[in-house]
Amino acid sequence: MWVLTPAAFAEKLLSVFRQPLSSLWRSLVPLFCWLRATFWLLATKRTKQQLVLREPDETKEEEEDPPLPATPTSVNYHFTRQCNYKCGFCFHTAKTSFVLPLEEAKRGLLLLKEAGMEKINFSGGEPFLQDRGEYLGKLVKFCKVELRLPSVSIVSNGSLIRERWFQNYGEYLDILAISCDSFDEEVNVLIGRGQGKKNHVENLQKLRTWCRDYRVAFKINSVINRFNVEEDMTEQIKALNPIRWKVFQCLLIEGENCGEDALREAERFVIDDEEFERSLERHKEVSCLVPESNQKMKDSYLILDEYMRFLNCRKGRKEPSKSILDVGVEEAIKFSGFDEKMFLKRGGKYIWSKADLKLDW
């Protein structure tokens, strides 16, 4: 098929009017063909342009598939909020006295294992407060024997632990972390870790011995705050020789240790980033030191509360998900605010099974 240019079309049109009417139809036939071809070409061009514009959108839709839910590799289960200490900066305070029935807690732990959990850390409150440590011991044994978790750990203030507990449950526990913010007993009293006639530091040394005797890896957690920020703990930490010394910057959580609904007023304990860095510099010779600033700490932990709800701390306060017992792990973890990249960046995954630590007991 041939196509006329606009100039040729005008010339042809003039020639039509010069011809007799008898030949008019023969002259118009090529014009109709030209018009038809022209409109067809325009329509084809427009369709191609629309396809080109649409392709990136379709690609974008394919790229914007919803992300897969996070895997609960390491979970911190605060099964109780009750505590026998009154640490001024505590960010998980005794707002309820609820503790799940043992079998319900086990059901939730099984759900977590099925979702990919490798490490469980029991915390509080003070976890040894419930049933004098028996509730905790049964959960520890369940996780190691029945769930076969690579790592089972506890964070405690250490004041209620007895040697009998190690005799009954020590073999099932990988790591015991004891909170110790100062080796000056007067500072411990100021912070709220006073034990009356007991000495927190002396008790820490006794627990270190029990951990060695019963083959439990020993760890120390310290919160750097206004009252201990100038203290040098290098020699004491080296003498105790923990596998890890976790050093946290004092953190404010609205509704827990600051704000109208809080049970603590932690503002007086807060230090700035520069002060925290100076404290870390002072302890740089401690090889087991693992620092955690507020930035690293806030969103890099998967925290379950006493109802087995994930707690989202992204907005500076704890916003609970629905319980994993009601909606399952995959649905609840979507609302956890968990930053998996920061978890890995802060060294959240490490050698955490005592079988792999190869310790010289």
From Swiss-Prot:
EC number: 4.2.-.-
Intracellular or extracellular location(s): Endoplasmic reticulum membrane; Golgi apparatus; Endoplasmic reticulum; Lipid droplet
UniProt cross-references to SMART domains, sorted A to Z: Elp3
Alphabetical GO biological process terms: CD4-positive, alpha-beta T cell activation; CD4-positive, alpha-beta T cell differentiation; defense response to virus; innate immune response; negative regulation of protein secretion; positive regulation of T-helper 2 cell cytokine production; positive regulation of toll-like receptor 7 signaling pathway; positive regulation of toll-like receptor 9 signaling pathway
Induction remarks: By interferon type I, type II and LPS.
Keyword Iron-sulfur: yes
Disulphide bonds in the chain: none
Keywords (A to Z) from UniProt: 4Fe-4S, Acetylation, Antiviral defense, Endoplasmic reticulum, Golgi apparatus, Immunity, Innate immunity, Iron, Iron-sulfur, Isopeptide bond, Lipid droplet, Lyase, Membrane, Metal-binding, Mitochondrion, Mitochondrion inner membrane, Mitochondrion outer membrane, S-adenosyl-L-methionine, Ubl conjugation
Cross-link (Glycyl lysine isopeptide (Lys-Gly) (interchain with G-Cter in ubiquitin)): 206
Cofactor(s) the protein requires to work: [4Fe-4S] cluster
Catalytic activity: CTP + AH2 + S-adenosyl-L-methionine = 3'-deoxy-3',4'-didehydro-CTP + 5'-deoxyadenosine + L-methionine + A + H2O + H(+)
Ranges for domain Radical SAM core: 69-289
Chain positions with N6-acetyllysine modification: 197
Class in the EC hierarchy, top level: lyase
Binding sites annotated in the UniProt record for [4Fe-4S] cluster: 83, 87, 90
GO CC, one annotated term: mitochondrial outer membrane
Highest taxon, organism lineage: Eukaryota
Alphabetized Pfam families for the sequence: Fer4_12, Radical_SAM
PANTHER family for the chain: RADICAL S-ADENOSYL METHIONINE DOMAIN-CONTAINING PROTEIN 2, S-ADENOSYLMETHIONINE-DEPENDENT NUCLEOTIDE DEHYDRATASE RSAD2
Entry's family note: Belongs to the radical SAM superfamily. RSAD2 family.
Subunit structure: Homodimer. Interacts with IRAK1 and TRAF6. Interacts with FPPS. Interacts with HADHB. Interacts (via C-terminus) with VAPA/VAP33 (via C-terminus).
Alphabetical list of NCBIfam families matching this protein: viperin, viperin_w_prok
Functional note: Interferon-inducible antiviral protein which plays a major role in the cell antiviral state induced by type I and type II interferon. Catalyzes the conversion of cytidine triphosphate (CTP) to 3'-deoxy-3',4'-didehydro-CTP (ddhCTP) via a SAM-dependent radical mechanism. In turn, ddhCTP acts as a chain terminator for the RNA-dependent RNA polymerases from multiple viruses and directly inhibits viral replication. Therefore, inhibits a wide range of DNA and RNA viruses.
Protein name: S-adenosylmethionine-dependent nucleotide dehydratase RSAD2
